[in-house]
Amino acid sequence: MKVFAKKVFKGENPNIKQWDEPTIRQFNGKEVYGRRTKGYGTSEFNYAGKLYKPEPWTEDMELIKSKAEKWASEIMNRPIEFTFCLCGLYETGDDSIPHHSDTIPTLDDVVLGVSFGGTRVLEWSNYANPIKAHTNTSQVDLNNKGEPETTQFLVEDGDVYMFDGHSQMKTTHSIPPLIGCQRRISLTFRSGL
């Protein structure tokens, strides 16, 4: 399952006052310079080699989280609770994420992303066969999987996208570099942690 919707969160503002500094790490044999990030919630989360011990939800983040849970619960037709949010700052068009598959605890858990600020492209690549052994990993095997069908979506201020563990078994996604774009904040809420 994957869902994209326009302007659901238009007018909201996470008001993140202080960001954690980025880290440099290896990803698919390449050195990747990360973005500035911040973690909020009640559960720890390991992302890109860093263990996030989240800050408590701020009032602004709690409002957005509640709206995200309500929206996700309506789409999924069952209660959804988000226990962690990874906030990412894209200061310029050089800030990007290569194609990857998210770690999701179970096939039924969900990730919901909300975009604030500048417009970016979200690339979504679908493979015919599974690219992961199980959903609770970000390790992918693209050998002999064939060419993916890739779709691009413009992600604008207030837009939301959501996917579950089932979708991550056969897909990757990325935010490629984009020259001349404005500052963007991404909130990625997670269930099942």
List each language-model region with its residue ranges:
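Non-heme Fe(II) oxygenase metal-center motifs and adjacent flexible, charged/small-residue loops
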Residues: 1-193
